[in-house]
Amino acid sequence: SGKYIKLKTLNSKTLSYKDTKVLVGTKYTYKVRARKKAGSGYIYSSYSKAVSTTQKLSKPGLTLKTTKGKQILSWKKVSGASGYYLYQKKGNGSFKQIKKCSSKTTKYTVKTKKGTTYSYKLVPYRVINKKLKNGPASSVKSRKAK
């Protein structure tokens, strides 16, 4: 419903463009057209068919470090995330959410019981129009507690 703006003028040898200023969860629609120098101005082709896309959250990388009596989880910030859900599974149980972290959080320490295997996964989320949208979960990290 918004209007189109010119992002960039590219030379004839450039066949792609990366829009680096997009916001996660926002729909963007793009069109292109060719131009040719004609005297002191340009001749323009018709616009291409519109193509739409919505930027999604990236899959987070999760690191697990085990020390005596605790496990330390750390990750890099996911661009556009409003925060993270941290899930834990003990042994063969099922995953349960153990923490909801802010977007500024990149580390969390969990107390553990020696000999128990713990598994973790991290899910980024973004609040869009007062609704939570989850991104892809990290790979599961598992380790036996010391």
List PLM regions with ranges.
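Beta-strand-rich modules
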Residues: D19-Y42, Y108-L132
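Polar/charged side chains located within well-ordered beta-strands of beta-rich proteins
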Residues: D19, Y30, T53-Q55, Q71, ...
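Pro/Thr/Ser/Gly-rich low-complexity, intrinsically disordered linker/stalk tracts
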Residues: V24, S40-G80, K130-K146
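Intrinsic-disorder/low-complexity, polar/charged segments enriched in Ser/Thr/Lys/Arg/Asp/Glu/Gln
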Residues: T14-S16, K27, A50, K70-I72, ...
